């Protein structure tokens, strides 16, 4: 039987060779060259993180909080480089989440912390 870590490295290599990863990497490299774009994305992600932390702490997330984040997203995504980066990042994150779910489901590891529990 093959070592699970070796298989994990093979999966990582396959992911690096995927079109989705290549798209993300190219978009990220473009953003990395522009400090203004990097700062815009950083500010957006910081606000997104703060909102998620509020939710996880059981604090009220108001419609105003959500609207403010949506407005910020709409503004920054008017820039085609930022829109491409965020879109590519979301697609890559979805693939990674799908892979995690496939693994968790196949070994019947359904833990609420991972969000895979049957409801």
From Swiss-Prot:
It comes from the Bacteria. InterPro entries: Com_YlbF (IPR010368), YheA/YmcA-like_dom_sf (IPR023378). Belongs to the UPF0342 family. This is UPF0342 protein Athe_0692. It comes from Caldicellulosiruptor bescii (strain ATCC BAA-1888 / DSM 6725 / KCTC 15123 / Z-1320) (Anaerocellum thermophilum).
């Amino acid at each position: 039987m093959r070592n699970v870590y070796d298989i994990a490295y093979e999966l990582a290599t396959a992911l690096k060779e995927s079109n989705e990863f290549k798209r993300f990497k190219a978009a990220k490299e473009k953003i990395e060259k522009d400090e203004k774009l990097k700062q815009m994305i950083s500010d957006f992600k910081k606000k997104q993180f703060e909102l998620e932390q509020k939710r996880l702490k059981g604090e009220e997330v108001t419609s105003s909080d959500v609207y403010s984040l949506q407005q910020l997203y709409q503004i920054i995504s008017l820039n085609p480089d930022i829109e491409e980066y965020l879109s590519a990042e979301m697609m890559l994150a979805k693939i990674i989440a799908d892979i995690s779910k496939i693994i968790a489901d196949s070994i019947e590891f359904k833990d609420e912390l991972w969000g895979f529990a049957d409801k």
